[in-house]
Amino acid sequence: MIENKSLGSKIFDVLNVVFLVIVMLICIMPVWYVLCVSLSSREAVNAGKVAFWPVGFNLLSYQKILGEGEFFGSFLISIKRVVLGTAVSMVCVLMAAFPLSRTKKQFPHKEIFMWILVFCMLFNGGTVPWYITMRNYHLMDSIWGLVLGTGLQVFNVILAVNFFKNLPSELEEACFIDGGGPWRNLISICIPLAKPMVATIALFTMVMYWNEFFQGMVLSTRQSSYPLQTYIQQMVVTLDYSTMNVEQIAQAMKLNNLSLDSAKIFIAMIPVLIVYPFLQRYFVDGITLGSVKG
């Protein structure tokens, strides 16, 4: 039987659709505008003519960025950083979160360790001690310096702890009855059930490693060691005409800094836009994970 909606319900549905469309446009338009600016001519950008489509279409900004020989090396460094960093971070997060999610009987004084982690999240030693530590461990100009510098995110640990706490205790008891221990409980039961949480934290970590550029500036003494974000930032900020020939200088004069920045931003978004659709279904699973099932 189809229930007829009241006038108030129909009005609500219409307003809800209008609101969601507005939110969608608010999210999409900045990305579209950045793309339009990156594809527009210098004159059009300076005159403020770019709005909803490129004006004076050209690919000079992307040619400038992609034409540098170091670009692909920096791109490869960023890919390695994301892959290694996400793997290391997920291992650290899961290894820290699982014991902290156990009961007091299983892990006495766990509150002390949790408060230590929270304290380190709120207060840190500062950039200079961190730099000295990384230098003393010979992690300058090393991919491991870019990975281990932010290997453990306390916020992600807290998310994982809360997720593990909500798993049914009967599953752990059944594992122990079958002769399993903590390792089997973690690997065979908790992690498979925590796929939505693992995917969410992995996406957060990947985005963090991909977008982070400050550590590359601090830990890299050579341009060949720059991750992609640091390389693009340095290229845009420090445009060195002394190393260019006449043709390159003429090309640079046709560019606008805003166009270069827009191209940089759009290139930085591409990997995330590619990865997100593959992880989206885990977000849906995470939303319905705690629902009542009949």
PLM regions and their residue ranges:
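A hydrophobic, multi-pass inner-membrane permease signature
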Residues: 2-294
